[in-house]
């Protein structure tokens, strides 16, 4: 049995080897749908990308004329170093998401393929509700690793990542509801044969 690595160690290595360059390509379709859903009715917004990787979403979305502030946070030192190298305009922070608090709260938090790398994702959901978001704000996340997406179940072994928590769509919604989010809903995008699609979960802080 091969020794498993922490998610941060794995993504540090991705940044080192250039494997992170595929993140935008692989996730752009689902993330664009999340962004459209989250921002279509907003005249302006400030946002945090939770688990920003090399900063591709922060770079792209900060160019939206309605975006007044964009912050990327990630636990991987190499990812943040790369993000800062590629983008001198926006703010990037290397920190544990569970411990970090922004200097200024935002009205949108987006996260793609991050939450299941935490031992207790509900704890992170609650922390974001309490410490990151203003009133009248939204958290929206996308995940590909969930119970209904059967093909993803082998990923912990395939990738050698030590923490990957597998939950159902309803369990993910419960995490949001238990963290006091309202108007919680979920749906799936980009489904195809043998692939249930990216699961999107969102809720509002009113």
How does the language model describe each region?
Residues 144-163:
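Short, glycine-/aromatic-enriched active-site segment of Class I SAM-dependent methyltransferases
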Residues 1-40, 147:
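Conserved class I S-adenosyl-L-methionine
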Residues 48-50, 54-99:
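Class I SAM-dependent methyltransferase SAM/SAH-binding core
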Residues 181-192:
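Conserved S-adenosyl-L-methionine
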Residues 164-180:
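Short alpha-helix
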Residues 110:
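A conserved beta-strand element that flanks and buttresses the S-adenosyl-L-methionine
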Residues 122-136:
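A short glycine-rich, Lys/Arg-flanked "PGG" loop and its adjoining helix->strand segment in the class I
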Residues 136-144:
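Conserved beta-strand signature within the Rossmann-like core of class I S-adenosyl-L-methionine
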């Amino acid at each position: 049995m091969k020794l498993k690595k922490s998610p941060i160690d794995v993504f540090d290595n991705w940044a080192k080897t250039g494997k992170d360059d595929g993140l935008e390509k692989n996730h752009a379709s689902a993330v664009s749908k999340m962004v459209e859903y989250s921002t279509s009715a907003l005249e302006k917004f400030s946002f945090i990308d939770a688990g920003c990787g090399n900063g591709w979403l922060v770079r792209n979305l900060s160019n939206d004329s309605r975006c007044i502030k964009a912050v990327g946070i990630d636990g991987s030192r190499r990812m943040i170093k790369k993000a800062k190298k590629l983008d001198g305009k926006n703010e990037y922070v290397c920190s544990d998401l569970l411990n970090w608090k922004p200097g200024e709260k935002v009205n949108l938090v987006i996260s793609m393929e991050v939450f299941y790398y935490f031992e207790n994702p509900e704890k992170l959901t609650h922390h974001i509700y309490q410490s990151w978001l203003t009133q009248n704000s939204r958290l929206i996340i996308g995940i590909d690793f969930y119970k209904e997406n059967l093909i993803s179940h082998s990923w912990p072994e395939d990738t050698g990542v030590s923490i990957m928590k597998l939950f159902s769509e309803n369990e993910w919604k419960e995490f949001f509801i238990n963290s006091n989010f309202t108007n919680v809903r979920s749906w799936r995008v980009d489904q195809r044969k043998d692939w249930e699609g990216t699961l999107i979960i969102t809720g509002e802080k009113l």
